[in-house]
């Protein structure tokens, strides 16, 4: 069974999440100014992302996930590391799911056991 990009994105992507990211970035601009004037010289976005993820783990407030996404995006745009690069990796180099298995892998395992 193949799925179209439209079907995949309808089920497994959130435009509402991206809109919340945009709203938060806009509000942050009015509070703090241009991001490229702050990152990475005055603050490191990846450190902010780690702090917000820790807050999410404590509070389960999904607003922190919006913050994490924005800080990760800012780190992508304005990296703290001078040697930062984008290098796509194949599945064999992926670190995978943290202590878990995907539904697809589970079902493939069941099929192989039959």
Regions found by a protein language model. Give the residues of each.
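Flexible "arm" and connector segments at domain edges
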Residues: 1-114
